[in-house]
Amino acid sequence: MCGIFAQIRRSANLRPPDLKQVSQLLQGVVEQLQQLSDDANALDADLLQESVELARAADLAQQANLLLSGLAGFTALANNAELAAELSAGLSQAENLIPAALENPQLLDALWSIRHDRLQTANKALKLLGSSSQSNTLQCLSEFQLGATLSIQTALSALDRLEVRGRDSAGLSIILPRLETGQLPTSLFSRQYDDQFTNGSVRFSAEAGSRSAPARLQADLATVCFTYKVAATIGKLGDNSQALYRAISADSDLRECLAIAQEHALVLAHTRWASLGEISQANAHPLDSTSASGRPAEVGISRPLVIAAVNGDIDNHSELLANHDLAFPTGVTTDSKVVPLLISKSAHNSDNLAQAFTTAVEQFEGSAALAACSLDNPDKLLLSVFGSGQSLYVGLADDSFVVASEPYGILEQTNKYIRLGGGKDTVKHASEAVTLSTENAGKTEGIANLGSNRTVSEIITAEITTRDVTRGKHAHYLLKEISQSPLSVSKTLQSQASPENVLAELFQGGKVEKIVAIGQGTAAIAAKAFAEI
C-alpha cells in the first residue's frame, strides 16, 4: 500500500479570530475544571463524568478549537506570537486540571487538537518559513504564503500518519500557479533538467517554454512546481517527513516564489511502499510526465506537464508504453510512471483536461487510486479510484479540499468527508473520477463527477480524531495497539452498554452463560486476556 495526500485552496475573505476571545474561552475551561476539581471528592466517577461543569468545559474548548481552525485561525496565530504563547500557557493550565480518570472525549479531543493541530502546527510553520522563534511573526506574509505554508505542514503531518501504509520513500510537490516570470529567481532554471524528478527538482508549465530558453521564460506568467523527495530502505517512522521538512525549509528559491504568489498553492504528497520498482528517489511519488525522449524540452512545451501520485498497481503499464510510444527516463522503474505520461499525452490531444483524464484512466488495468494535476491548469485536482480495495477521502475543510488515502490523513483540517471507492457510501461503478476546483474548494459544488451516471456521495462525519490516531510516545503503531488493548475492550463495552441497562441484572440472575471475545491481530491479544479474567 501507499498513501496519498493533497490539498487545494480557494481565496476567501479571511476573518482571523480575535485571540483574546480564544484566551477567554480557555480561561472559562480552566474555571470550570477548577470547580470540577473542588467537587471531585464529593462526586463518584459516574456523576463526575456527567457534571454540568465538565459539559461546559467541553463546549468552551470546542469553541476555542473551532476559532483556531483553518487558514483564518493559523493566520491569527502567525500574526500574534505573544498571544499565541499566552494561549499555550492557558491550555497548559486546563490540561493540568483534568482528573486522571476523566473520560470525556469532547473535552480531551478539543484540548488535544488545540495543542497539536493548531499551536504546534503554527510553530512548525514559523520555522518552515525561516522564522527561528515565536518572537518572529509572519505579519508581513500574504494570505497565499500562509496558505501554502499551512498546506505544506498539514501534508507533512499527514504523511507521518499515512506511513502505516508504507514508508520506504516519500515525496511532496508544491505547485504555485501563474507567477510573474520576471520576478523568479534565476537560480530556479537550472533545477528543471533532472529527468528523474528527484529531490529539489523544479518544473514549469508548458506555455512558459522553459527548457528551450535557459534562464528565461517565454511567457509573462508561469506555474512552478517544487518537488522534494527522500528514499531509504532502512529508517524509523517519522524520518521521511523530517527529511522533507529540512529540505523545504532550506530552499530559498521556494521562499522567494512564495513571496510573489498571487494565488493559493496546490500541494500533492505521497508515502510509498515499493511493490514494483526499486526504492529510490526516481521511483518516489509524486511522478511527472517527463519521458525518455532524450530531449526533455519537448515535455513542458508540446505537452502539458502533469504531476501524479498513485496508490496501487497499473498491471498493463508495459502494454501502454508500447502502444503509445512512451518510455521512462533512465532510472525510473515504477509502473506508476505511466500515469502522468499517459494523462499528459491525452491532454495534449484534447482541449478538455477532465475528458483527457478519463480517457487515460479508462485505459489503466489493475487496482489503483490516483491524484493528478496539470501545471497548465493548476486550478484543478484530478482524482480517480478503480479496481478493488482502493479509496480516496475528500475532506471538506474551510475554503479547501483535503484529500487522503485514509480518513486519518484529513482529520487535522476537517472531520467531514466524501469517500471515493468501494463501500456502501459510494456509487457502485468500475471506476470513479472527480475533479476538484479551487473556485468552490471546500464545498460540494467544487466537486465535478466525470461521467453522467455518477453522483457525489453523501457527506460522512468521522468518528475519530487526531488524538485517536497519534502514535504518541510509541516507536511503532503495533506497540500503541498492544498498550491500548485494555482501553479498547473498555470502550467497546461502553459503546454497547450503559449504566442504566439490564446488563448487571443479567449477570446477577445467572442468565448469561457464555461471553465470546473476538479479535484480529493485536485485538486478538486483548480478546484472549479478556477471556482469561
Language-model-derived ranges and their functions:
Residues 1-512, 516-520, 525:
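Conserved short alpha-helical segments that host acidic/polar catalytic motifs at enzyme active sites
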Residues 531-533:
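Short helix-loop-beta junction
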